[in-house]
Amino acid sequence: MKKALVSLAALSMVHDAYAADTLPPAGKTWCDPYKNYSCLDSYLGDDFFTRLVNYYRLEWGRDGSPVDPKAPPSRRDYWPATPQTTPPMPFTEWPYGGTTSFGVTRPNSTDSPLMAALGNTTLGQALNENHIQIYGWINAGGNLSNNTVRGGNAPAADLYNPNTVQLDQAVIYFERLPDTVQKDHIDWGFRIAPIYGENYRYTTAYGLWSYQFLNHNSNYGYDLPMAYGEVFIPQIMEGLLVRVGRFITIPDIEAQLAVNNYMYTRSMTYSLDNYSTTGVQTSLAVTKNWILQLGATFGTEAMPWHWNAQIANPFPNPLYPNNTMPKDPGAVPSVTVGVRWTSDSDNDSIYVVADVINQGNWGYNNLQWLGLVYYHKFNDQWHISFETYDVHQNNVLNILNSAALNALNRGGTPFSPQYMPFNGPFGAQCANALVFSCTAESRAALWYLNYRPNPLNNISWRFEWFDDVEGQRTGTKTNYIETGIGWQHWFSPQIEIRPEVSFYRSLNAPAFNGNFNLGIPRDKNIALIGSADIIIHF
């Protein structure tokens, strides 16, 4: 691991020397598509593998792809300025969810070596003509940790097993983007995005291949965190977009897809809140500065077919007093409301959300999320991202109550070990041991400070506080603080490395180096984790 990090660092220091001019592929005459876009196809070559290799070669050391001078404008001319660039950031617009970005999205706009390689084939031409793209990435990494128990890095995110190398995620998108720049016709889009790797642990929805996580605790698994269609109606104000299917929940700085994050690891703030939901999400651009959102879905990490589904209850109790009980009490109709404002300069953006709100009963991950995200750009080098929220669930079983714990162990809850032998939701450690259940709450605040020295590098400092008030989110009733620093270096728009080091401290009780699935208690208050990953886009 150490040798790998040294090698990556050395490679990053020398690679720019090869990017001054684009050299022609073997057997080709001089051609630089960055200066003469019309020669791009000639530069790439004829067969698939030659074109694929040459496209990676073309972009090496660059911070973007060649620009077609005949392409239509990539944004509405009166729209707020684009605050960032990719690379080195994981986004160009300040992130907001549940919709394709308004005013700045054109079809076929993703820079993809695979699509370039397919460009002169019958399949590639058909895909391009229908504005469909196929692309993705492979993300692998490893960590060095003071923890030693399998699963002992948790609740730190993404590095479940300490001192290991892993395939984090292999992802492929099948996608059509609606054209949100134009205002003269209704357009449509879709995305189907299967994922495979260790990170399936963080996207699993109960009822969709969840046996891998809940019944087998598989180290690697597959999921489909995004499968949706959408319609864009530009004639309504500045545009109305309706999305239907399964999609990532709308708030948060981060996302579970590797390419959407500054650092390799995600914050505890993100990893312990909502991930995905299924249903309908509407987003209305009222003006160029204001976006309103309203969604109707079926809970968080829940499937619609679990709504009203019942299972036998072998041990009726005060929480579930009948002979049957809900399979997932969180799989119920839910409402999401969001408001986003951005300044004309796009130096400031604030996003306030009530996410997937329902009765709030203890579910697989039925979090009632209330919070906001704020971004501020100081200049082209510096910006901050800030997020804070409060989440809660009601009627969470109290594991400090002996009668409640007996009901849990004897199959009297939907999340008893008879139904979920691994990774079921935690109960609460209520303030009063005499109550059978209580409301479990958690609060968080997250800060990223980012410095961009040049177009291929970004340095991120992360600081966060997480208060697991009843211990329902992490299994330990404690406050956490975490701070980490990471470097994102891009060799090209297609290849990125992200070394980092993070320090975690549990202030009130040991919270690391244990494994509830294996019956190993946590015995450390501190986790120090160094890690690095690589993302290769295709």
Show the residue positions of the predicted features.
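Outer membrane beta-barrel
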Residues: 33, 125-146, 150-302, 340-349, ...
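Signature for the C-terminal beta-barrel architecture of outer-membrane proteins
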Residues: 103, 181-187, 231-242, 267-445, ...
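N-terminal periplasmic/intermembrane-space "pro-region" immediately following the signal or transit peptide
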Residues: 2-150, 430
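Transmembrane beta-strands of outer-membrane beta-barrel proteins
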Residues: 135-143, 191-195, 243-247, 295-297, ...
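Residues that define the transmembrane beta-barrel architecture of outer-membrane proteins
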Residues: 130, 161-170, 220-225, 274-278, ...
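Outer-membrane beta-barrel proteins
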Residues: 145-149, 199-205, 251-256, 303-306, ...
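Flexible, surface-exposed loop regions and adjacent strand-edge segments
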Residues: 151-155, 206-211, 258-265, 309-318, ...
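Outer-membrane beta-barrel "beta-signal"
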Residues: 491, 495, 522-538
